[in-house]
Amino acid sequence: MIDFRENWRIILLVIVVIVSLFALVSPTLASGPDSNSAVVQQSSQTNLQYGLELAGGTRVRAPLVGVTAEEVEFEPANAREVEQRIATAIDGAGPADVIARPVTETTGTVEVTVEGVSTTELQSILESTGYTASTVRTGVTETTRQEVVRILENKINEAGLSGGTVQEVTTAGGGHFILIEVPNEDAASVRSLVSERGTVVVQAHYPQDDIYTQQTVLQQDNFQSIGSAQEGQSGGAYVPVTVRESAANEFQQATVDTTLARPGGTRCTYSRDQNSTEPCLLLVVNGEVTNSFGMAPRLADSLRGGSWAQDPVFQLQTANVSEAQEVAINLRAGALPAKLDLTGDDGGTTSFISPSQGENFRTDSLLAGLVAVFAVSGVVFLRYRDARVALPMIVTALSEVLILLGFAAGIGYPLDLSVIAGFITVIGTGVDDLVIIADEVLAEGGVSSRRVFQSRFRRAFWVIGAAAATTIIAMSPLAILSLGDLQGFAIFTILGVLVGVLITRPAYGDILRALTTGNL
């Protein structure tokens, strides 16, 4: 008669294995055709999903062009002036190539994203224009990198490239790169996609003869600068926009003619009802309305009075910073605030893996895993020459891999070569721990009772627990930091260690106890 209370660890292992098998093969967990997860290809027999290395596609890894001056002394209200003055001092640069971002009430950062500008040159330009900075370094700010990631994600999604991912990765030396992975696309298409510019226009939406009509009031090249999202002093957020002087008068007159600049301003309800709203400004990106805005009374008064064209700046108000960031992205119509350095001089690389090569990698990975299993099995049988000890050891170790595969399938984590390496590592470390258990239990002769077994097993488990803690601590930085492929390796190595310590090692202990003492 099986004592379920004494063998609950074995029962737990069986349950977890069954759940993992369900996650692997159940059609109810299969990703639909519209899934937008970081997936390149899904196995037809299982729910496993493969990354670029095992399925094919293009990977672009490149830094951003730019130099940044930190702790530059200027007030937030003067950010646009800073951009214009510094841009004027740089040959071939416009205000859009300079980003002045307030950090405190008296200082901020200044980024120049023109190719060929060195830190020494930016330092000299700042001094010649009357500004001082504490440090000038190569690279852009974290805010700019995050904005680039969001813009590229939008571009990939709009292009209909299912499974494309964009993320920021950091090297061990502190370098920052943008990593783009797009499935089933060649390198030339991906490079063109991430560098091309969309189209954006601003239209006036207003009633004319009882029929609502749209009139374009600003073209893409009418913008002199598009600021970053900023928090408002009285709540909400906004995006500051500067219009070129050559287009300012025409825009000013258009807002009057379309009744946008009416006394008291306008309240836009376009998102709720397009045919009953007061006049609105519509932001149209690639032919699609992405945002709508009313007009503040003060701005309407300056437009009607004709004074606005002398200082052609206005703010697009939003409810929160997140929405303002989306507006800034839409205004740029896919234009990056800083270019990707695809020349390769500073570490930028583009790689393409054909689908056939990815299939070969899958086959080779499977063979490597089988070789690891048979090699470990052979060594274990040679070591113990006792199937009662060796066979459960191999089955338990393989169950760890099965559990990890089920976990990967359940959450839709794409498998790549680094994850496969993690699985092979789990097999090795798992069997190593099981050998420690078997040696400790059997080293002092036969096991005469359950009490003797438990005493020896506890000693072995302390050693295993200490080794597991060391592995987790060592792998944690790789799992937390954005280090590309190393992250997947570290994550699944840590998961394998946790599964082993919490589930499979205790279960193997119960199996070994039952086989050596004859008590279930």
From Swiss-Prot:
What parts of the sequence cross the membrane?
10-30, 364-384, 391-411, 417-437, 461-481, 483-503
Per the annotation, which location comes first and is thus the protein's main one? membrane
> Which keywords has UniProt assigned to this entry?
Cell membrane, Membrane, Protein transport, Translocation, Transmembrane, Transmembrane helix, Transport
Establish whether keyword Membrane is in the entry.
yes
Q: Does the record bear Protein biosynthesis in its keywords? A: no
The record's section on SUPFAM superfamilies has: Multidrug efflux transporter AcrB transmembrane domain
Protein's cellular compartments: Cell membrane
**Stated name of the protein:** Protein-export membrane protein SecD
Q: What is the lineage of its organism?
A: Archaea, Methanobacteriati, Methanobacteriota, Stenosarchaea group, Halobacteria
* Gene name of the record: secD
